[in-house]
Structures are given as structure tokens and as C-alpha cells.
């Protein structure tokens, strides 16, 4: 008889339902918060990647401008040489507001034509993110460029 009385007594059922709802809501809140934090981190990584990319672009553009200034004197004196001549690569580091670009200007011969390749490695200050860009053009026609 006492067994039936215990089963029919529903005084504590509401408390169990409330606790169950609180546990479920806590789990959902934790999952949403974890997803939010993960998305914020991903956005920061992508933002750093874009910034490093544009630092690398700036490095290529600075190097190209240096080759083109003074009536292309650096380009003609250093890179416009015989096809069998060895050209020593030029290197420099350009410091920008939010990072650095390691620049290498090298030359190679392909199908009897001399090409110049500007390689720029963009590094963002305060981050390990780096991006590398390359621009290639023929010595005779620097206006026609190929980006890699």
C-alpha cells in the first residue's frame, strides 16, 4: 500500500523537470558560446592572413617601383645582361606600419628570354602569419606582369 502512495505522490516532479530544463539550457548555452569563440578566432586568423597578404603586395610594389625609377636604371644595369650571365639576387626588408616584407629580386632565363621575379614574404607584426607573393616579368617588357 505504501508503494502505491509513493508512486502517486507527484510533489517533487516539478523540481526534477526544472532541473532537467536547466541542464539542457546550460548545455545549449555552452555549445553556442564555444561556437561563438571558435568563429571569433577564425575571423582573427583570416584578418591576419589578409593583412599579411597586403604587406606582401606592398613589398612587391615597392621593389617594382625601385626597379622602375630613374628611367629603369637599376633594372637595366643589374638585370638586362647577357643570357649566359649569372645575376646576383637583390634582397631587402621593407618595414611598414603593421609588418615587414622580405623582398628578393632574382632573374632567370626561360626559352631564351630573361625574366625578373620579385618575391615578397609579408609578415604581420605580433602574429606568426606570413604570406608569399611573386611577380614575374620580362626585362624588356616590365609592364606585362604575372602574379603568382
What residue spans do the PLM features occupy?
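Acidic surface patches and DE-rich sequence motifs
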Residues: 9, 96, 124
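N-terminal leader/signal peptides at the extreme start of proteins
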Residues: 1-11
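Low-complexity, Gly/Pro-rich coil/beta segments used as flexible assembly/activation regions
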Residues: 50-117
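Aliphatic-rich helix starts adjacent to a transmembrane/signal segment
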Residues: 13-55
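Residues within well-ordered beta-strands of beta-sheet-rich folds
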Residues: 119-121, 136
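Low-complexity, S/T/G/P-rich flexible repeat/linker segments used as non-globular hinges
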Residues: 126-148
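Surface-exposed loop/turn motifs at beta-strand-loop junctions within extracellular Ig-like
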Residues: 23, 122-126
Amino acid at each position: 500500500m505504501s508503494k502505491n502512495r509513493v508512486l502517486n505522490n507527484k510533489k517533487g516532479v516539478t523540481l526534477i523537470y526544472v532541473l532537467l530544463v536547466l541542464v539542457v539550457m546550460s548545455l545549449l548555452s555552452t555549445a553556442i558560446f564555444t561556437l561563438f569563440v571558435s568563429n571569433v578566432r577564425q575571423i582573427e586568423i583570416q584578418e591576419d592572413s589578409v593583412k599579411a597578404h597586403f604587406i606582401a603586395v606592398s613589398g612587391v610594389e615597392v621593389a617594382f617601383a625601385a626597379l622602375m625609377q630613374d628611367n629603369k636604371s637599376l633594372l637595366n644595369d643589374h638585370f638586362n645582361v647577357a643570357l649566359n650571365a649569372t645575376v646576383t639576387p637583390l634582397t631587402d626588408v621593407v618595414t611598414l606600419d603593421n609588418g615587414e616584407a622580405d623582398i628578393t629580386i632574382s632573374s632567370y632565363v626561360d626559352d631564351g628570354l630573361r625574366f625578373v621575379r620579385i618575391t615578397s614574404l609579408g609578415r604581420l607584426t605580433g602574429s606568426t602569419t606570413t604570406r608569399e607573393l611573386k611577380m614575374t616579368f620580362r626585362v624588356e617588357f616590365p609592364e606585362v606582369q604575372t602574379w603568382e
